[in-house]
Amino acid sequence: MMTAALRARHGPARFNLVQLCRGACTLTALLAEGLPLMTTFFQRAVSVACVAAMLASGATPLVQAQVNLPALGDTASDDFNLGTERKLGDQIMREIRRDPDYIDDPLLLEYVQSLWQPLLAAARQRGEITAEVDQRFAWEPFLVRDRSVNAFALPGGYIGVHLGLIAMTATRDELASVLAHEMSHVTQRHIARSIANSKKQSLISAAALILGVLAASRSRSTDAANAVITGSQAAAIQGQLNFSRDMEREADRVGFSVMTSAGFSAGGMAAMFEKLDTASRFNDAGGFPYLRSHPLTTERIGEARARAGSVSGSGLGSGFSATEQAAPPTVLEHSLAQARARVLMDTRVDALRRWQALDSQTDADIAGQPLHEKLGNACASALASTLLREWARADKSLLRAQALIQFNPRAFAQADSRAERAVALLHAQSQLERGNTARAVEVLEPYESSVAAVNTSRPVLLMSARIALSEGLPAALNLPRLTRSAEALQTWVSVNRLDAEAWSSLGQVWGALNQPLRALRADAEARYALGDWVGAMDRLRAGQRLAKRTAASSTAATAANADFIEASVIDSRLRDIEAQRKALSAEEQRAG
């Protein structure tokens, strides 16, 4: 990914995202369950945050730690308002986006968004999201490269999804049920309710849990953290487990209504619960952190089955087994997303070899497999071979996938067109990785035949930019491609202003088109979106210096006018980011 290079330049986040996700899951559930379940990392983070929280509340900690935290409030009576919650979420996400385990895979993210957006629309239509909450919160899902089965909600409407969760779900409805559940934790404001329903010590625990990850990134003093871990455990909320279970049941109920209103199968939630319950009984090696933060009970499973059975036309009776439901129409697309997640969640060589080995199956071996399983296995093997740079085996699996499309036209005609497009994008990726740019263009061209089509497909947009930036095409052919990519990317980021990958691609395209001022501005926006505000300001100041030199030496009026407009934008953005950074510093000083 292009943003990986940006992260490498300004350094990764100073905490481990996988540990955060495994330890945090949903912050509300940890509030209820207390601290003993946390990882060593999160214990350290919570301890440091507790020091600051106790200082703010007037308590005397065992060790004074010099840490700066965003101001949450001095007393438990302070309202944990929408602005505060969003601000905390934004600050956490600025760190998460810089972590190596944060993954922006365009195909997988587009698939998750294709489930998320109908859920969000249904929640709005049902009145689960008030106008103020809708406007204030981010409503943004993101992906985490981790094999464990997990999803979690953060303050401000951010939802994390582990690739391991996508990899183990059999249908889009199962995955949608988890997204709907996590969305409901946000819409019902469970984090804020946990704080509001507690005493002052509960606020300390809340501050520790929500802000601990930020404290850990700002403090290197583990001695201070260890000195107060016992105290922080004692200060944690007691007797809240029943309340947490009420929250889980509420999220189940609201989430079920939202997902069915969005058009997903009523059996999806029950199917997911049954799958998690069965898997956890046979595997208790820590691969299912979702169950630690969202404890499944017989009651919750029974309620999910009862809700599914009560939906008119669901065909669910007392003998219903959720896994026996017919596959939804978009099963091909889900199978491709599942296969991609399985490969990308663990890119170590041994893991890739296991998925690559699927290409050894003969036609007789797969004769009884359903189409979606055959296609998923072929694409998993092709992607694994591509990452291993073993092109002959990649071609073998790609040919099998293409043959499945060719000989099953009716199935693909009925499926979402994104399934066939996903295979083409994988093919283009494989060709590009081996330096065959001309072949990559040939494969992708049907899907980028118009600017409008490119603008509606982020994966095609970014792949087109990668092709334009690669070597291997004559300049006469590549210049129009670069120009089209610049126009399409500029249109995209004007709407999706925090798309770091798109901004990074745009910066490189402008550089290739000999537009250094625009390239600097785009690079600055990419850094800003990743949470590197200092790097963003550095790029913007470099743009200001370049604009002054250009204005002094320019002889072409049109070029000068264009540079003046871009320079004005750079000046404005620099003022905005400086003001945001100043406000954040002021909050840290108030809490320090």
What is the meaning of each model-derived region?
Residues T28, E33-A45, A49-F152, A279-R281, ...:
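Hydrophobic or amphipathic, alpha-helical segments that drive membrane association/targeting
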Residues L203-R218, A227-A235:
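Membrane-active amphipathic alpha-helices enriched in small hydrophobic residues
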